């Protein structure tokens, strides 16, 4: 009986969501923040606007429940480990 009870406790602990939350870099400050519950994906969106030639691509960093949908002209990268979406500034040559 004790073995059965212990097995049930272990299975319950393994199956429960233990409240782990992902940390992602989030714009506008590109600081690491804890994502809201249910948002376990970090993303980086980049695109060109009218100032792209002088300022570089626009960057949006954040958390999401699923990887955002790809739109024409927008590059999206998604990952699922803590702080896996760092902002790398564009360097002019």
Swiss-Prot record:
Taxonomic lineage from the root: Eukaryota, Metazoa, Chordata, Craniata, Vertebrata
Molecular function as annotated in GO: acetylcholine receptor inhibitor activity; ion channel regulator activity; toxin activity
Tissue: Expressed by the venom gland.
Signal sequence region: 1-21
Species whose genome carries this gene: Ophiophagus hannah
Role, per record: Binds with high affinity to muscular (alpha-1/CHRNA1) and neuronal (alpha-7/CHRNA7) nicotinic acetylcholine receptor (nAChR) and inhibits acetylcholine from binding to the receptor, thereby impairing neuromuscular and neuronal transmission.
Name by which UniProt lists this protein: Long neurotoxin LNTX-2 homolog
Compartments where located: Secreted
Annotated keywords: Acetylcholine receptor inhibiting toxin, Disulfide bond, Ion channel impairing toxin, Neurotoxin, Postsynaptic neurotoxin, Secreted, Signal, Toxin
InterPro entries: Snake_3FTx, Snake_toxin-like_sf, Snake_toxin_con_site, Toxin_cobra-type
Cysteine disulfide partners in this protein: 24-42, 35-63, 48-52, 67-78, 79-84
Record-linked Gene3D superfamilies: CD59
Major subcellular site: secreted
Entry's Gene Ontology cellular component terms: extracellular region
Family: Belongs to the three-finger toxin family. Long-chain subfamily. Type II alpha-neurotoxin sub-subfamily.
């Amino acid at each position: 009986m004790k073995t059965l009870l212990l097995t049930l406790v272990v299975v319950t602990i393994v199956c429960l969501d233990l409240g782990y939350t992902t940390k992602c870099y989030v714009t506008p400050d590109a600081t690491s923040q804890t994502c809201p519950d249910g948002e376990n994906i970090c993303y980086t969106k980049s695109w060109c606007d009218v100032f792209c030639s002088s300022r570089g691509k626009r960057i949006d960093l954040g958390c999401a429940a699923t990887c955002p949908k790809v739109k024409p002209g927008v590059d999206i990268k998604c990952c699922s480990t803590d702080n896996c979406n760092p902002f790398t500034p564009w360097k002019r040559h």
